[in-house]
Amino acid sequence: MTLLDSTLVSVQPTGQGSFAVCKVIKVQTPRGAVANRVIKYDYDPLTAYAEFKRVTVYRANGKVDELDVKKTCDYAAPARAIYWGARQIMLEIGALQPGDVVDYEIAKKGFTYALLGAGDEDDSRFIPPMRGQFYDIVPFWSAAPTVRKVYKVAVPMEKELQFQFYQGECASSMRYENNSKVYTFAMDNVMPFGREPNMVDLFDAAPKLMMSSTPQWKDKSLWFNKVNEGYGSFAPLP
């Protein structure tokens, strides 16, 4: 069972986001102990960077273990059919017992859609190609029962943020904090989303949040279409 699935995003004027991804998992069965003995997280090195900030295990017997995040493994993510060069970070927790609680935080910076080609090697590659604009698609479904799921994003005061929640409902709010607009979206008691034979992708059927700092939804699509036209992506011959 997931007790908390929380993401906090701080958006810079360039559109780059700094993400704090926190998760608290309670092991209830031997099967759950096996499933959670290793933590994995996927990211695209062309557009983002991710690392474990902390991992704490609260044992059922009262013992508290702080894991060494320097033992993190970073490797090419498993793929098939199409190989995008995605990577995965992994940290082994080791043996768990029912009643143990795993609490970890992952720090990520970057954005969530692909570049046309390889970017620079410095932090400028984490700035979205549509410079100054922030965009995200947040899945609000879960593979395990989740007590609370929260997505919180802070944007500069001068930026506007439009959003739409699809295939469900969530609680939302906007507040002014530390010279930023802070938007919070939350759902309680999220149950695993059932799948059916030959159904569409979960992004087209399960609850999700979409947001963009562009004045209109279509602006991002029009911008990318124009860039790809100029790049020659739609040319009939290479």
Annotated model-derived regions:
Residues G32-V64, A206, M210-N225, G230:
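Carboxylate/His-rich catalytic cores and anion/metal-binding grooves
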Residues L46-I89, Y113-I137, Q164-F185:
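Solvent-exposed beta-strand/loop surfaces of large extracellular or lumenal domains
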Residues V24-K53, P129-E158:
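Surface-exposed beta-strand/loop patches in extracellular or lumenal glycoproteins
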Residues K109-D120, P129-Q133, F140-P238:
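Secretory-pathway-linked proteins and extracytosolic
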Residues M1-Y41:
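Early extracytoplasmic/domain-onset interaction patches
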Residues M90-A95:
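Exposed beta-sheet edge/beta-hairpin loop segments within beta-rich domains
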Residues C22-V24, V101-A107, K152-A154:
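Residues within well-ordered beta-strands of beta-sheet-rich folds
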